[in-house]
Design a protein with these regions (language model features):
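Juxtamembrane regulatory segments of integral membrane proteins
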Residues: 726, 735-736
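Short Gly/Ser/Thr- and Asp/Glu-enriched loop/turn motifs at secondary-structure junctions
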Residues: 51-52, 541, 722
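Short cysteine clusters
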Residues: 718, 723-727
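Cys/His-rich metal-chelating microdomains
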Residues: 730
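Acidic, low-complexity intrinsically disordered tails
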Residues: 751-761
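Helicase motor core with emphasis on the C-terminal RecA-like subdomain
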Residues: 2-41, 45-48, 52-151, 155, ...
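Extended Lys/Arg-rich polyanion-binding regions
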Residues: 390-393, 399-417, 424, 429-446, ...
Length: 761
């Protein structure tokens, strides 16, 4: 499908065949009124995976449904849930069975409310979120049968106030965890502990609910769901929904000479290529949806596409629009209707709309930059051909090592199962606050500790020593006057979060983790919040406040950070010939020293500005590898070349780890040195950016052969001469991307991998 004159940008083209549906009958146990409501909306039968998941939930088995986009996952849990609600009612409609629905975003919970309301059933549905009034909350507690909320409200409101919710919690029959693949990293660890607290509080009120999890396709769904809930979970993962033929294209923008640091080439911006592709497709009357990472990017792509279309045919000049969060429901519905009717032929949308967007009949999807996981990639591509027709999916690579690797190694994207979620619910920095919250909800008993994992007893001792909990008789009690739930911000990596304040109004726009504020919310930073672009004026670390205002800036910023590291404890290691790979606990010292401004259109570096921010210390997990002097001698690398070779290997390995650990490159960091004092050898570290670790470095250790092999291949295959952002240059390097030795990095990694064996089957 390459446009005329640009076939050289297509790195891979693959055709996936169509798949027919496998149907199943409605179960006899289903409430006839619920079945009739679905039949009235054209659903005459189920797909096989819907029936299997619904039957498992009805039988009281905890189940995870892990299937593709548009495979009808909501019906699979709504059928048993709504049936239980209706058949469990007492006299005069008294609540007999309750359902709790958890979504990662408020918007998705509201979309779920709309979907249930459209069935026209007499089920009492309510949302419980930060916008709910006191009167609404009281009605929800006393009357609602199907409560839609999010993990944040469960943690801060419902669980601490569980005694006020006793009648509802005592009636709870089902807990639905939607979009479960989004719970990863530190957020996933927090949610895992919140769900354990929920199970404990439900038992206190006499309920033992069945958990039903819905997820995009992912590896080992029963393992991930079990780690999230602490329960034994049955997986339904065979997708029986129909799929049309899908053409997939991996697209790489061309290099532009001399626009980067030290004269390095940079690639044309993915957003510019995306606008060109939308134009090409719309001219051919192909209905197209483009996923773009930010609202600013969405608006830019839509505007540029219309400009290009106007040059081709003035009648096409307004056939592309933008679709992003923040629109009113009626605006969203109007845009959806315009796309369905054909008035609009193209739309640019933020990645967040992979959750809950209701647009069918699309012919093509263009993804501007790899969305971070194979699960998200397939979910976005799945938006095309949703009615079962044939479709086109295009991934446009951004200028970084991960995107570069994927378009040159298509099997890594298209030939592997999607990732399992990575998170560590036993992280003591996460577990501690939740043990405190649990003790305030109800004093902790010794026989309850296994619920919270193998480190609970150890962490409890630390909490007692810190004076936060007190052991009396056979239980642990919360001793502080504060609300224990306030100790944990479940979307934060640790420490008091920094509030983001709009300077002109004083309005709180959001928060950012204390750990990331230095690098993302410093003075002069361009900050993207829910897709909107803001310019930070000041960062006050004492008051934990960053003041910023909306911006139309045409540049982006990236912080430069200096890092040092020491090994606290080596937990595990493996010999790779004479080299070694290790995993353990480290102490990382970091200081943001400056930031770069880059053109948003071209990626060209505009300037660098120094910053005066304090050093931070972080105890976290890391993976590291060492190469002894005798092996280095055989590589032929001169001593003066070793720092640049190690530095280049470190940068690219950080860029590639997200392919194996479902993280963002900003969630991790690294250090490299030709001689580290703790090992006495050349050492390269990659560490988690969160206190206590988030599981990313450990995943790197477990998949090191594949991860570091991909690192080596990315550097070797890049067409630049000395290094560029697609291979070894890092946007956050505190040393100004010096020294870097591209050829030396390949030789160094060859020496390491020559002795390597797989660390995980």
């Amino acid at each position: 499908m390459a446009a005329p004159g640009r076939p050289e940008r297509v790195r891979h083209h693959r055709r996936l065949p169509a798949r027919p549906a496998t149907l199943a009958d409605w179960p006899k146990w289903a409430d006839p009124t619920v079945v009739a409501a679905y039949r009235s909306r054209g659903v005459d039968s189920l797909w096989e995976h819907q029936r299997r998941a619904a039957d498992a939930a009805r039988a009281g088995r905890h189940v995870v449904l892990s299937t593709g986009t548009a495979s009808g996952k909501s019906l699979a849990y709504l059928l048993p849930a709504l049936t239980a609600v209706r058949e469990g009612r007492g006299p005069r409609g008294r609540r007999g069975a309750g359902v709790l629905y958890l979504a990662p975003t408020k918007a998705l919970a509201h979309d779920q409310w709309t979907a249930i309301d459209a069935l026209g059933l007499d089920v009492r549905v309510a949302t419980h979120d930060g916008d709910s009034s006191p009167e609404q909350r009281e009605w929800t507690r006393d009357h609602a049968e199907y409560v839609l909320t999010n993990p944040d409200m469960l943690h801060r409101s419902l669980l601490p106030g569980h005694e006020r919710w006793s009648r509802y919690l005592g009636s709870l029959r089902f807990v639905v965890v939607d979009e479960a693949h989004h719970y990863r990293g530190v957020f996933g660890a927090h949610v895992a502990q919140v769900l354990r607290r929920l199970r404990r509080v439900c038992a206190l009120h006499g309920a033992d609910p069945t958990f039903v999890l819905a997820s995009a396709t992912m590896a080992d769904p029963e393992v991930a769901a079990g780690r999230l809930t602490g329960l034994e979970v049955t997986a339904v993962a065979e997708d029986a929904s129909p799929r049309g033929e899908l053409e997939l294209v991996l697209w790489e923008p061309p290099l532009i000479e001399g626009g980067g640091e030290h004269g390095a080439p940079v690639r044309r911006a993915a957003t510019a290529e995306t606008a060109d592709l939308i134009t090409d497709l719309v001219v051919e009357d192909v209905r197209t949806l483009a996923f773009v990472r930010s609202r600013r990017g969405v608006e830019t792509v839509a505007r540029r596409s219309n400009e290009l279309l106007g040059e081709v045919d003035p009648a096409l000049a307004r056939r592309v629009d933008s679709y992003r969060g923040g629109y009113l429901p009626e605006e969203r519905r109007a845009l959806e209707a315009d796309l369905r009717s054909g008035r609009l032929l193209g739309m640019a949308a933020t990645n967040a709309l992979e959750l809950g967007i209701d647009i069918a009949g699309l012919d093509a999807v263009v993804i501007s930059g790899y969305p971070g996981t194979r699960a998200a990639f397939w979910q976005q591509v799945g938006r095309a051909g949703r009615a079962g027709g044939s479709a086109i999916g295009v991934l446009v690579a951004r200028d970084d090592p991960l995107d570069t690797y994927l378009v040159h190694h298509p099997e890594a994207l298209l030939g592997r199962p999607v990732e399992g979620t990575v998170f560590d619910p036993d992280n003591p920095y996460v577990l501690g606050p939740h043990l405190c919250a649990a003790a305030q909800e109800k004093p902790l008993q010794p026989d309850e500790l296994d619920l919270f994992g193998p480190r609970a007893r150890e962490v409890l001792r630390d909490l007692v020593d810190a004076g936060l909990l007190r052991r009396r008789a056979a239980a642990w009690f919360w001793t502080d006057r504060r609300r224990a739930a306030d100790l944990a911000d479940i979307r934060s990596a640790g420490g008091r979060p920094v509030q983001l304040i709009e300077g002109s109004t004083g309005r709180v726009v959001g928060t950012v983790d204390a750990a990331r504020a230095h690098s993302t919310a410093h003075a002069g930073a361009i900050y993207l919040h829910r897709g909107e672009t803001w310019l930070v004026d000041t960062l006050d670390l004492d008051e934990h406040v960053a003041v910023m205002d909306p911006s139309e800036a045409t540049f982006t910023t990236s912080a430069r950070e200096l890092t040092d590291i020491r090994i606290v404890e080596e937990v595990e290691s493996v010999a790779w010939g004479e080299c070694r790979l290790a995993f353990g606990t480290t102490e990382v010292s970091q200081q943001v020293v400056s930031y770069l401004r880059r053109s948003a259109a071209t990626g060209e570096v505009l300037d660098e500005t120094p910053l005066d921010l304090p050093e931070r210390t972080l105890r976290t997990t890391a993976v590291w590898w060492t190469v002894p002097a005798e092996v280095l001698a055989r590589t032929g690398l001169a001593a003066a070349d070793l720092p640049g070779a190690a530095h280049a290997a470190e940068h690219c390995s950080i860029g590639l780890l997200p392919l194996f650990a479902t993280c963002d490159r900003w969630d991790i960091g690294g250090v490299s040195t030709a001689l580290h004092p703790d090992t006495g050898q050349l050492t390269v570290f990659v560490h988690d950016g969160h206190p206590g670790g988030a599981g990313f470095a450990e995943r790197g250790f477990r998949t090191a052969r594949d991860w570091l092999g991909a690192t080596r291949d990315t550097i070797a295959a890049c067409e630049c001469a000395q290094g560029c952002p697609s291979c070894i240059q890092s946007p956050k390097c505190g040393n100004g991307n010096e020294p870097l030795d591209k050829a030396g990095a390949v030789r160094l990694l060859d020496a390491l991998l020559g002795g390597g064996v797989r660390t995980e089957e």
